[in-house]
Amino acid sequence: MKNRLKVLRAERDWSQAELAGHLDVSRQAVNAIETGKHDPSLPLAFKIARLFNMTIEEVFHDEA
């Protein structure tokens, strides 16, 4: 699943560690989601969307 997480994080000038702190996950988890190696759980996807005041669909989209 593709996502805009890296762009959204960069717009706020946050490091991966800072974003991880906001989400209560590890920096490695943020990196795995940003690079598409891992899809977030549904609760985490909602948390990410809320953090950026967006819908899940605005942050994440299917690769198809």
Language-model features, listed with the residues they occupy:
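DNA major-groove recognition helix of helix-turn-helix/homeodomain DNA-binding modules
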Residues: P43-E58
